Regions:
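Predominantly a Rossmann-like dinucleotide-binding segment in NAD(P)-dependent oxidoreductases
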Residues: 130-132, 140-219, 223-226, 339
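Active-site loop of classical SDR/Rossmann-like NAD(P)-dependent oxidoreductases
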Residues: 14, 37, 290-302, 317-320
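N-terminal Rossmann-like dinucleotide-binding module
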Residues: 1-52
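Contiguous beta-strand/loop segments that form the cofactor/metal-binding neighborhood of enzyme cores
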Residues: 199-275, 301-313, 331-332, 346-349
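Short, conserved SAM-binding/catalytic segment
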Residues: 45-55, 119-126
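A structured beta-alpha segment of the ubiquitous adenosine-cofactor-binding alpha/beta core
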Residues: 59-78
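Beta-strand-loop-alpha-helix segment that lines the small-molecule cofactor/substrate pocket
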Residues: 78-139
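C-terminal helix-rich "cap/oligomerization" subdomain common to oxidoreductases
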Residues: 50, 79-81, 124-129, 240, ...
Length: 349
């Protein structure tokens, strides 16, 4: 089968460092076009392409015949990868779906749960006839370490406790900080939403079915003046089984942590991107497995392309999964705004 013609929508840091290399790495896709806000940024992205010599450029300032709608009108482009600012992305997703293009859109699925629900409803209604697929790019669902840990967890019984700790400092010299839509966020949670959905997705490898979250109480704070509206959160999460755990995340802390620790009836697992440690019921380490660290983006793009070729969506990229990731964080934000008032989860899987 011939490679699928694809366009990259957006030319920011992630498109340069992750999406473009991922598209060029798989034989299942061929890059046909790039769209960006400015022609210069589209040119910058195209200039680093290694295996895509004939890429057409589109932008909002390129004039007649080179707008987003013109890209979507092309028959040789069947799919688009969209990586735009959180508030801007939904309208570009809707336009692509309306045009019958398969979509892989960066997380979060939308700025908030209400907008995400509307987007999913739009997709289901609009694409009944054209069959366009809608997938969300959550690369933490494609990291080998978390996949391995989740598979091992199946043999350990139900979850009894968990502790997620992701602590870091987004200082004002960080290149991601200097993207304007992140510096002055017009969406809930700021960096704690932008990054937080990654960490909720990783936690949800283990928190599913009877172990899915059912309620949360949280406190939130803005510690660093340059990270509005908040940069730190501490949440106690209750599961449907009645078990409880802690979800702790800060992008404004001088503490460093990046681990998902989960206790089960028959043992425990500590998962990190480069290592998984499995212990028995009395705490003895029974296995330590190392992994080469990967962002997971090349894996997720390849999985998406394979799903398009087969005509069967990859469940890991389902919009409903991304909706659950978003709800997990949004309820924490709402609880924090209400001084720790309990919030009920309704969309966990």
């Amino acid at each position: 089968m011939a490679p699928i013609g694809v366009a990259i929508i957006g030319s920011g840091i992630f498109a340069k460092e992750e999406h473009l290399p991922a598209v060029e790495k798989t034989d299942l896709l061929t890059l046909k076009a790039i769209f960006s806000r400015s022609l210069k940024s589209a040119q910058d992205l195209a200039s680093i392409a290694k295996n895509s010599p004939a890429v057409d450029l589109y932008s909002t300032d390129s004039g007649e015949g080179k707008a987003y709608k013109d890209l979507l009108a092309r028959d040789d482009i069947a799919a688009v990868i969209i990586a735009l600012p959180i508030n801007s992305q939904p309208e570009y997703i809707e336009a692509a779906l309306t045009a019958g293009k398969h979509v892989l859109a960066e997380k979060p699925i939308a700025p908030d749960v209400a907008a995400a629900k509307k987007l999913i409803e739009f997709w289901k209604k609009t694409t009944k006839d054209n069959g366009a697929g809608f997938a969300i790019a959550e690369n933490f669902r494609f990291m080998p370490a978390f996949d391995y840990a989740a598979e091992k967890a199946k043999d350990l019984g139900r979850v009894t406790h968990f502790n997620v700790r992701v602590l870091t400092l987004m200082d004002d010299t960080n290149r991601f900080f200097h993207t304007s839509w992140r510096t002055k966020p017009e969406f809930q949670g700021g960096f704690c939403l932008d990054g937080g959905v990654h960490f909720s997705a990783a936690a949800r490898h283990f928190l599913r079915g009877p172990d899915a979250p059912s309620a949360v109480q949280a406190f939130t704070a803005q510690v660093q003046p340059h990270l509005p509206p908040l940069d730190s959160l501490h949440a106690i999460v209750q599961l449907q089984s009645g078990a409880q755990g802690v979800f702790q995340h800060s992008c404004g802390s001088t503490l460093k942590a990046f681990e998902w620790a989960v206790a089960f009836e028959k043992g425990s697992i500590v998962a990190e991107p480069k290592k998984v440690t499995i212990s028995g019921p009395t705490g003895e380490v029974v296995e330590t497995k190392d992994f080469t660290r990967t962002s997971g983006v090349s894996e997720e793009v390849a999985a998406w392309a394979e799903a398009l070729q087969k005509g069967v969506a990859d469940k890991r990229q389902a919009p409903e999964e991304a909706l659950a990731d978003l709800e997990f964080m949004e309820k924490i934000f709402r609880s924090g705004e209400q001084n720790g008032a309990a919030q009920k989860y309704e969309l966990q899987l």
